[in-house]
């Protein structure tokens, strides 16, 4: 479904341990799943407000890394109630029949310093397709509740 291309994933994750690889759980306060779609002669922007996910990240060997996300399809928000209702309908996400969207990585490849390609399976409306998501590693640092990483 071209509707989600390009999908922009921005996430910050709380670090549970210092050993590699490290699994980061989504911190929804500092994370977002947003999209930008061409509509007629303009762009429509939106986001999903309810999601969960994790990234297993190995900075020394990114091939050992993985990503998983689950998104509640009914949480779509474009700041237009009529459009949101249409997107939730059978015409698009059919949220009553398909309450979640998901992504599960198959492979993570380094594209150079702080750049990754994450190849995986995106499932929308029960249809699974291979997609590649470009990811930028923003860094790892100290946060108010311990170590955090940004992607």
Language-model segments: residues:
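Sec-dependent signal peptide recognition
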Residues: 2-9
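N-terminal signal peptide c-region/cleavage motif recognized by signal peptidases
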Residues: 14-16
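Low-complexity, acidic/polar, glycine-enriched regions of mature
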Residues: 18-151
């Amino acid at each position: 479904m071209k509707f989600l291309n390009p999908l922009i994933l921005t996430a910050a994750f709380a670090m549970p341990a210092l050993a590699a690889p490290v699994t980061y759980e989504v911190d929804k306060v500092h994370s977002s799943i947003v999209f930008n779609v061409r509509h007629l002669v303009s762009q429509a922007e939106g986001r999903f407000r309810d999601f969960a996910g994790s990234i297993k990240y190995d900075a020394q060997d990114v091939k050992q890394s993985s990503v998983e996300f689950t998104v509640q399809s009914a949480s779509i928000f474009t700041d237009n109630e009529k459009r949101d209702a249409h997107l939730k309908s059978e015409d698009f996400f059919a949220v009553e029949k398909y309450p979640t969207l998901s992504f599960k990585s198959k492979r993570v490849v380094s594209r150079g310093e702080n750049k990754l390609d994450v190849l995986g399976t995106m499932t929308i409306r029960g249809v699974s397709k291979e997609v590649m998501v470009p990811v930028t590693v923003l860094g790892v640092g100290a946060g108010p509740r311990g170590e955090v990483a940004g992607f």
